[in-house]
């Protein structure tokens, strides 16, 4: 039985639109009604996220609903996996891609002929709901953590609005670092933040972690990229958080702030900033540390050398390279 949102009928259309906007409506089942109530099938989502986007009374229930009869068309991945099997097997074309707002970013090697790159871009444009398609021309690089992109199909623009976890974000995929694959990680942090927390987001970018911490008392959002801070300010206004989030354009090493919850989302270089994080965090506070590695041991030893701490939680966020992962560790700092 699908998970359903039980609401009063009078809120039906508005609620349906909000669920669609946030990609939470389960389209495999039909919406049904009984008496004064509607039952809207939804995807698995935390109740707190629903409360943050729906200003109405609701109940989460499991209910038998009629399945939609859908004639399934071949997906983008299915088509390219057949048409370009050789290039995929050689590691030149990846079946994975990112969706940021209404833009798609593919992973296709420079070694693939331009004509084929364009063909794949057009396929993505037709089969993935989007307005524009790009491919990565480089890895993330430089002080601002951005990558070169090549336009393949659709609209040739890089600015978009991305929606996740009940909030919206302006993102320019050519000028700032942003990973939609960390949406689940941001939802995890969102649940941990309390009303009295003072959060310091050391590498804030356009503010996805800062805005996820919206229930905190105060959030310092720091970044060295002026384009990121410009969009962060727009995102603060877009999500009506002017009274909570303080944007700071600076190298974090030059900023003098304190907090009881520190976010270090800079996996490749976070180890270089541990001393600064320990300077920022209050004793008894928590550091959310992101790094790249084969296991958790190296990160734990780094912290244990510098302070009295305990690991509250550790998890693999996603694969980074063969036998390497983006790792998340939550450290409670008992004494510095």
Curated annotation (Swiss-Prot):
Query: Which processes are annotated in GO (biological process)?
Result: tRNA methylation; tRNA N1-guanine methylation
State where S-adenosyl-L-methionine binds: 186, 223-224, 251-252, 265
Upon changing residue 145 to A, the result is: 16-fold decrease in methyltransferase activity. Lack of tRNA-binding
Alphabetized GO MF terms: tRNA (guanine(37)-N1)-methyltransferase activity; tRNA methyltransferase activity
Bilayer-crossing regions: none
**Which Gene3D superfamilies does the record associate with it?**
3.30.70.2580, Met-10+ protein-like domains (3.30.300.110), Vaccinia Virus protein VP39 (3.40.50.150)
GO cellular-component term (any): cytoplasm
Q: Which InterPro entries match?
A: MeTrfase_TRM5/TYW2, SAM-dependent_MTases_sf, TRM5-TYW2-like_MTfase, TRM5/TYW2-like_N, Trm5a/b_N
Q: What is the effect of changing residue 265 to H?
A: 3-fold decrease in methyltransferase activity
Q: Which CDD domains match?
A: AdoMet_MTases
Q: What is its main location?
A: cytoplasm
What does the record give as EC number? 2.1.1.228
Q: What is the effect of changing residue 226 to A?
A: 16-fold decrease in methyltransferase activity
Task: Name the UniProt key words of this record, in alphabetical order.
Answer: Cytoplasm, Methyltransferase, S-adenosyl-L-methionine, Transferase, tRNA processing
Summarizing the annotation, the consequence of altering residue 267 to A is: 1000-fold decrease in methyltransferase activity. No change in affinity for tRNA
Q: Where in the cell is it found?
A: Cytoplasm
What's the catalysed reaction?
guanosine(37) in tRNA + S-adenosyl-L-methionine = N(1)-methylguanosine(37) in tRNA + S-adenosyl-L-homocysteine + H(+)
Q: Which family does it belong to?
A: Belongs to the class I-like SAM-binding methyltransferase superfamily. TRM5/TYW2 family.
- Biological role: Specifically methylates the N1 position of guanosine-37 in various tRNAs.
Query: What is the protein's quaternary organization?
Result: Monomer.
The name of this protein is tRNA (guanine(37)-N(1))-methyltransferase Trm5b
The source organism is Methanocaldococcus jannaschii (strain ATCC 43067 / DSM 2661 / JAL-1 / JCM 10045 / NBRC 100440)
